[in-house]
């Protein structure tokens, strides 16, 4: 399975440097000088190899210089390029509570009483933390976002293909927070 570890956001300067959005927990390894990256444009399948010539942090962003990319025009041509690895290249985690995103995608999500909620379609990474995007099953279809925290996600079994959750009251309610369904008996009508 192909996993994205970075995306070229834009060029930087006139000497061919690239601003890369990092999508890996190990950027110092993936983008080390001398590393060979495989990249492709979105919606294309042909991979091209790029060798990292230089890598540096600049204001919290990763800047890369690749062999053969020597000016702004070359760098602009790579805008949107996705750097990918094959999931078989990943080392297994030593931590039983640590998972790669692709390991969680597709797992069945159930409540602690066994009631099926849906399946994980994506792991979203935000400043506030990770969220599991769940495609609901049953009468209440649609997408559900569940914070990927121990207080809610009680267990994950890759072997069994199950994520068990114990959500707080209202989290699974599709009308939670919808003021149009609230009781209007306290209005100021005289």
Swiss-Prot record:
Top-level lineage group: Bacteria
UniProt GO molecular function: ribosome binding
Keywords tagged on the record: Chaperone, Cytoplasm, Ribosome biogenesis, rRNA processing
UniProt-annotated location(s): Cytoplasm
Span list, region Disordered: 169-190
PRC barrel domain residues: 95-171
GO biological process, one term: ribosomal small subunit biogenesis
Annotated InterPro entries: PRC-brl_dom, PRC_barrel-like_sf, RimM, RimM_N, RimM_N_sf, Transl_B-barrel_sf
Oligomer and partners: Binds ribosomal protein uS19.
Entries under NCBIfam families matching the protein: 16S_RimM
Recorded family membership: Belongs to the RimM family.
Free-text note on domains in this protein's UniProt record: The PRC barrel domain binds ribosomal protein uS19.
Matches recorded under HAMAP family: Ribosome_mat_RimM (MF_00014)
Name of the protein: Ribosome maturation factor RimM
């Amino acid at each position: 399975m192909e996993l994205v570890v970075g995306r070229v956001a834009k060029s930087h300067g006139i000497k061919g440097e690239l601003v890369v959005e990092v999508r890996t927990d190990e950027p110092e390894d993936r983008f080390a000088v001398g590393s060979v990256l495989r990249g492709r444009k979105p919606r294309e399948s042909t991979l091209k190899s790029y060798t990292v010539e230089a890598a540096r942090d600049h204001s919290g962003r990763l800047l890369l210089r690749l062999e053969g990319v020597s000016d702004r025009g070359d760098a602009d041509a790579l805008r949107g390029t996705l750097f990918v690895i094959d999931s078989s290249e990943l080392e297994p985690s030593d931590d039983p509570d640590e998972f790669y995103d692709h390991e969680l995608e597709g797992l069945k999500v159930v409540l602690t009483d066994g009631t099926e909620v849906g399946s994980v379609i994506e792991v979203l990474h935000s400043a506030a933390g990770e969220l599991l995007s769940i495609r609901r099953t049953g009468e209440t279809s649609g997408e559900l976002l569940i914070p990927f925290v121990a207080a809610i996600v009680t267990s994950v079994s890759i072997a069994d293909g199950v994520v068990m959750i114990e959500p707080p009251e209202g989290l699974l309610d599709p009308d939670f927070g919808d003021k149009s369904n609230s009781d209007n008996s306290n209005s100021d009508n005289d």
